[in-house]
Amino acid sequence: MTRLTDLGVTDLRDGIAKGDFSAKEVAESFLTATNEAEKLNAFITLTPDHALKQAEKADKDRASGQLKPLSGVPLGIKDLFCTNGYRTTAASKIIDNFVPPYESTITEKLFSAGAGMVGKLNLDQFAMGSSNETSAFGNVISPWRQKGDDTALTPGGSSGGSAAAVAAKLVPAATGTDTGGSIRQPASFTGITGLKPTYGRCSRYGVIAFASSLDQAGPMAHSVKDCAALLEVMAGFDPKDSTSVDVMVPNWEKLLSSDIRGKKIGIPKEYRVDGMAPEIESLWQRGIDMMKDAGAEIIDVSLPHTQHALAAYYIIAPAEASSNLARYDGVRYGERKTPEGGNLADMYAATRAAGFGDEVKRRIMIGTYVLSAGFYDAYYIKAQKIRALIARDFEAAFDKCDILLTPATPTAAFALGQKQEDPIAMYLNDVFTVPASLAGLPAMTVPVGLNEQGLPLGLQLIGKPLDEQSVLNAGLALEERAGFTSQPKKWW
């Protein structure tokens, strides 16, 4: 018999609706799995009361014939989303005990649709990182292991807790946020599916800000179909977010089709970068062959300015972060350090020195530097010009094709600690994901295979603005042909 924890979002939703099992049974199964997986350190805070309360409501709604779109589906929530009455930390000591008096729009939509919350998921501190090693609550450990090797691996970042929890089947799906690849890279590292929607498609209200012109929430799940079902609930205009796009939310799940015959798939030549592992190159070719097999036409395209994307991103994102993180000063909430005999300025300095981690401090310093009077034009303005050129490159490419197919990451998951001392090597993890973020485009990663060490590898699909449907459809075609069913062997 299939274990309930083996089922995805839509299977659980449909099973509860048919009466195959109760929402309470589902919640209890995932809560048990979570309690047995402390070694992964995927959660910062567990919320069994919320999951069980929502399950009880779902069972009552089923009895009265009033089921909602996600009734009884338990989810993991990245601890960057403010949850009314539940501790929200952004994985930082500076707001260690912050309990929001309000709900983020995304979680409000999910809970109103009947979903429950198993817990708040670990992440890189303030979503700044690519390996989940910058969390003040300890790093998340990937459920995956290399063949014959017990070395602890990164689940990716910043949504590492979300990726690890879904891959280990502690939750059927989770929310993530993506600023420069923080949904797509960890999804690729852990063999799950992750979707970053068009910038503005999902509300940022109540999501603790990293870089406001880049941050975008999205779903992480076991399948393309599950991502489509979740995105339908998460997306939508929100007047509380000034960057929210006022457009209709399509019925992505119902319109899902793997028939991509006649679609033009662009292959950007600039994504063949130095240092890309041969296994990634061959995986990309396999993906191209799968798209051909599905009836799509393959077209070579050029994105000439993407070679500068990483440099531009690591100027723009820290600049915005330095502004956003200026609000954490120890006055109203969170950590407060007051040196004996010190004044207000001393309290600010001591609080921020003690409360922020090294990577956050590094990015605040970079951001403050590039925004300073002497360097604003030389760095920040130049980076914004590059960003505009990258967006134009994508526009030109999409005149010739419908979707772009690229690698998701330059390597498979690496060992924890391997790149921690070298920020540049760590930043290079985002080389394939950052360009779509700078252009605000929808993009998703789909698991396609394993490398020789038995670790998952994914490919990325990038679409036109607000054309998540084409991305999902191409993702489904890839998913069906890849037939990826590998799971991590339980060691935790």
Swiss-Prot record:
Its EC number is 6.3.5.7. The keyword Protein transport does not apply. It catalyses: L-glutamyl-tRNA(Gln) + L-glutamine + ATP + H2O = L-glutaminyl-tRNA(Gln) + L-glutamate + ADP + phosphate + H(+). Heterotrimer of A, B and C subunits. This is Glutamyl-tRNA(Gln) amidotransferase subunit A. The gene is gatA. GO terms for molecular function: ATP binding; glutaminyl-tRNA synthase (glutamine-hydrolyzing) activity. PROSITE patterns: AMIDASES. Allows the formation of correctly charged Gln-tRNA(Gln) through the transamidation of misacylated Glu-tRNA(Gln) in organisms which lack glutaminyl-tRNA synthetase. The reaction takes place in the presence of glutamine and ATP through an activated gamma-phospho-Glu-tRNA(Gln). The active site is at 78 (charge relay system), 158 (charge relay system), 182 (acyl-ester intermediate). Belongs to the amidase family. GatA subfamily. One of its GO terms (biological process) is translation. The keyword Protein biosynthesis applies. The lineage of its organism: Bacteria, Pseudomonadati, Pseudomonadota, Alphaproteobacteria, Sphingomonadales. It comes from Zymomonas mobilis subsp. mobilis (strain ATCC 31821 / ZM4 / CP4). Pfam families: Amidase. One of its GO terms (cellular component) is glutamyl-tRNA(Gln) amidotransferase complex.
